[in-house]
Amino acid sequence: WRWGSTELMIINGPGQGEQDRNDGSCGLLVTAPNFSLLIPGDVSARREREWVRYWRDELSASVLVLAHHGSRTSTSHALLKWVGPEWALISAGRGNAFGHPHREVIDRVRQTVPVSLLDTSKDGAISISSTDQQGLQLSRERTVWSPYWLKLP
């Protein structure tokens, strides 16, 4: 569907029974005039490979939110290569119990595509903006405002 000049498209697989509830997640591809953003939800690498086989070039995006908060079961080489992002975002809470993002996922991202990697557990809220003159810009809230309690060990 469209919202002004922005198109939103649901990304999903064949819809067969899911062994893993996370694979029931659907993704969202947001395409704006100067950038695109893929939010894959909590899908596993297996579901990502199905998306790549089905959606192919439509998965291309300038910004990729890593699946499942940077879990080691997600963000496959296949997805990274087809999306080909300039930026990768990790949405994870600071000091979360699951240890997200996993080091092997960060290494996989860096080995597969040359991206700028932002992590909400370190950078705080991340804002995305884009203009014809300045192109795509992402800002980190913690570079703008950092309360004292976040600086504690």
Predicted regions mapped to residue ranges:
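Cap/insert and terminal regions of metallo-dependent hydrolase folds
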Residues: 48-125
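Core dinuclear metal-dependent hydrolase active-site scaffold
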Residues: 1-63, 122-153
